[in-house]
């Protein structure tokens, strides 16, 4: 009789995995109208038990995820205000929840962390493509590229000053959104 070896889930130590973890926490918190920190604590416990609902994070990635959650809670109002001013022609109610939460997460990083803008935008676009609708990646990229440009101009930097990583291939103007936001909003995050 041959025994099957169970594949051990190895923790991931990347910032991209931490961002996806926080996106899922943010999505669940908004969907269930539950405090973000409470969902994070529950998700961390589920992850530690080996459940694959949330990505397994190594210690550094988990610490980064916790910093993101704390910052999102602390600055949520300012983040939403900036997004309201940046996304012209769309209200939050008209947008897919996945797109909005990806934008909130990335906006926090662009505004309040020293992370270079291109990798933050690239990670956001990847998450949007994975969990959002057909046009989510382009929409998120367009909004964040415009926001990044505005933020750099506010501090007197050249828009090209932060080009330390290649920008994502998708581009769309910041005043556009997915053609049918309701159709692209799943009941819960989905794997691509």
From Swiss-Prot:
Disordered: region residues: 154-192
Gene3D superfamilies: NusB-like
Keywords of this entry: RNA-binding, Transcription, Transcription antitermination, Transcription regulation
GO biological process: DNA-templated transcription termination; transcription antitermination
Biased composition (Low complexity): 159-184
Superkingdom of origin: Bacteria
An example Gene Ontology CC term for this record: cytosol
GO molecular function: RNA binding
Family from the record: Belongs to the NusB family.
Function statement: Involved in transcription antitermination. Required for transcription of ribosomal RNA (rRNA) genes. Binds specifically to the boxA antiterminator sequence of the ribosomal RNA (rrn) operons.
Protein name from the UniProt record: Transcription antitermination protein NusB
Biological source species: Deinococcus radiodurans (strain ATCC 13939 / DSM 20539 / JCM 16871 / CCUG 27074 / LMG 4051 / NBRC 15346 / NCIMB 9279 / VKM B-1422 / R1)
Lineage: Bacteria, Thermotogati, Deinococcota, Deinococci, Deinococcales
């Amino acid at each position: 009789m041959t025994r099957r070896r169970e594949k051990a889930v190895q923790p991931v130590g990347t910032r991209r995995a931490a961002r996806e973890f926080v996106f899922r926490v943010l999505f669940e918190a908004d969907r269930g109208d539950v405090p973000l920190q409470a969902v994070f604590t529950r998700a961390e416990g589920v992850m530690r038990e080996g459940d694959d609902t949330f990505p397994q994070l190594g210690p550094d990635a988990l610490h980064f995820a916790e910093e993101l959650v704390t910052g999102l809670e602390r600055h949520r109002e300012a983040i939403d205000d900036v997004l309201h001013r940046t996304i012209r022609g769309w209200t939050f109610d008209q947008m897919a929840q996945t797109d909005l939460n990806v934008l909130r997460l990335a906006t926090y990083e662009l505004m309040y962390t020293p992370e270079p803008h291109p990798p933050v935008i690239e990670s956001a676009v990847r998450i949007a493509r994975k969990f959002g609708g057909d046009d989510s990646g382009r929409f998120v990229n367009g909004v964040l590229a415009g926001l990044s440009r505005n933020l750099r101009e506010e501090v007197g930097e050249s828009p090209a000053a932060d080009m330390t990583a290649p920008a994502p291939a998708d581009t769309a103007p910041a005043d556009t959104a997915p053609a049918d936001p309701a159709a692209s909003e799943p009941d819960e995050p989905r794997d691509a």
